[in-house]
Amino acid sequence: MTKLITTVKEMQHIVKAAKRSGTTIGFIPTMGALHDGHLTMVRESVSTNDITVVSVFVNPLQFGPNEDFDAYPRQIDKDLELVSEVGADIVFHPAVEDIYPGELGIDVKVGPLADVLEGAKRPGHFDGVVTVVNKLFNIVMPDYAYFGKKDAQQLAIVEQMVKDFNHAVEIIGIDIVREADGLAKSSRNVYLTEQERQEAVHLSKSLLLAQALYQDGERQSKVIIDRVTEYLESHISGRIEEVAVYSYPQLVEQHEITGRIFISLAVKFSKARLIDNIIIGAE
C-alpha cells in the first residue's frame, strides 16, 4: 500500500534509512492531477528501483502573475489511488509552508535555456521549477528521477541543473504518452470542447509531417515551420502561438539544421493551451 508522507522531516528520515541499507530510490516529481503520462513514469521507476517516490506539490514559484495558483486542480485522494494501483511506495505531499518556510535568501536563475520557447512566455517559470526540483532532490535524494519528454525544455533545463550542481541522480526522459489518435496526454485536455478535441489530434499529425520532411532531406527550418503552420491553419480553429525549431538540448534556434533538433508547437484553444513536440536526429 502506498504511504502518504506530508512533512519534509519524515521524508528525510525515510530516505536516510533507505540510503543506509543500500536501497535505490526512483523519483517522479509532479504537481498532481495525474494521468497516464505520469503513471508511465511511475511504472518505469517501479520496475527499476527498490522504492518509488512520487511528489505531489503545486509549486507557487513557477506560477506567473497572470496564472492562477489557487485554481490549479488538486485531487490528492485520486492521485494517491492512481499511483497505488501501479505500485508506488510513497507519495510525498508537503505543505507549501514546509517547502518554503520563509522567504528564500538565494534566487536561482536559469539563464539562456529559459529565455526561449515556454520560458520566454512565462518569465521566472523555470527559475521556480529549478528551485523546487533542487529542493526535492535534496530531500528525496533519488538515484533516478523521471521526467516526461512532453516538457522537453524543462527536461533539458533539469539535465543541465544536475550537471551544474553535481546532483548524484540520473535523469531518465520518458517518451510522450499519447491517446490512441495521437494527442499527447495532458491534464489540460479535459478543458477542450468536443470540436476542439477532434481538432487537437492535428498537433501530433503536424509533427509527423515535420518528421517526414526532415527524413526526406529538408534542412531549412523555415520550410518546415511554414509547412507545419499551413497544415495547422487548415485543420484547427485554435490560435497557433508557436511553431519553432531549436537544437536539443542546447535550445538554440536553428535556421539551417545540422544536428539533433526539437520541433515545438503551442496552440491556444478556448480554455486550454496545448503543447507538443518531437525530437529528431541522432544524439
Curated annotation (Swiss-Prot):
Pfam families given in the database record: Pantoate_ligase
Record InterPro entries: Pantoate_ligase (IPR003721), Pantoate_ligase_C (IPR042176), Rossmann-like_a/b/a_fold (IPR014729)
Taxonomic superkingdom: Bacteria
Binding site residues for beta-alanine: Q62
Catalytic machinery residues: H38
Subcellular localization, as worded in the UniProt entry: Cytoplasm
Gene Ontology, cellular component aspect: cytosol
Gene Ontology molecular function: ATP binding; pantoate-beta-alanine ligase activity
GO BP terms in the entry: pantothenate biosynthetic process
Binding positions for (R)-pantoate per the UniProt entry: Q62, Q154
Enzymatic reactions: (R)-pantoate + beta-alanine + ATP = (R)-pantothenate + AMP + diphosphate + H(+)
Positions annotated to bind ATP: 31-38, 148-151, 177, 185-188
EC numbers, comma separated: 6.3.2.1
Record Gene3D superfamilies: HUPs, Pantoate-beta-alanine ligase, C-terminal domain
Assigned keywords, A-Z: ATP-binding, Cytoplasm, Ligase, Nucleotide-binding, Pantothenate biosynthesis
Pathway the protein takes part in: Cofactor biosynthesis; (R)-pantothenate biosynthesis; (R)-pantothenate from (R)-pantoate and beta-alanine: step 1/1
CDD domains, A to Z: PanC
UniProt subunit comment: Homodimer.
Remarks, miscellaneous: The reaction proceeds by a bi uni uni bi ping pong mechanism.
Family the UniProt entry places it in: Belongs to the pantothenate synthetase family.
Purpose: Catalyzes the condensation of pantoate with beta-alanine in an ATP-dependent reaction via a pantoyl-adenylate intermediate.
Name of the protein: Pantothenate synthetase
Taxonomic placement: Bacteria, Bacillati, Bacillota, Bacilli, Bacillales
Gene name of the encoded protein: panC
